[in-house]
C-alpha cells in the first residue's frame, strides 16, 4: 500500500504487481488508465478504514489452533488487528479478524512448531498467538 489501500500479494518470480501504477486493485490517481492485463492482482486488499500499515506475517502451521492451520496471519501496525487469510490457487477464500490488540504490530515470527508470534513496537515485547481459554 501507499496512500489508500494495503495489499497482500502471492509472489511469483519476476512478477509485476503494479508498484507505482496501482494500489491493490485500483489505478493510482496519477495513472488513471493503467493497463492491468500484464499486472498480477493481489489476493487481498484493505482500505484505510480497516487499517493503515500492513505488517506481513506467516502461514500458521502450529497445532494449538487447528482452525488457523494453513491461514496466512498478518496484522496492521496502526490498528493492532491480526487477520487470518485463507487462499486456494492464489484466490482468497476468506479473511477473518483473529484478534485486535492494543499494540503496534511491527513484526511476526514463527517457532519450530509452527506457532506464530508478534512484537509490539512500543515495548519490544513478544506475544504468542494462542487459543483463548
Go through each PLM region and give its residues.
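Short beta->alpha linker loops
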Residues: 3, 77, 100-103, 121
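Beta-propeller domain segments
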Residues: 1-95, 132
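Conserved blade-ending motifs and adjacent loop-strand segments that build the rim/top face
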Residues: 54, 91-112
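Blade-level signature of beta-propeller repeat domains, shared across WD40, Kelch, NHL, RCC1
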Residues: 107-133
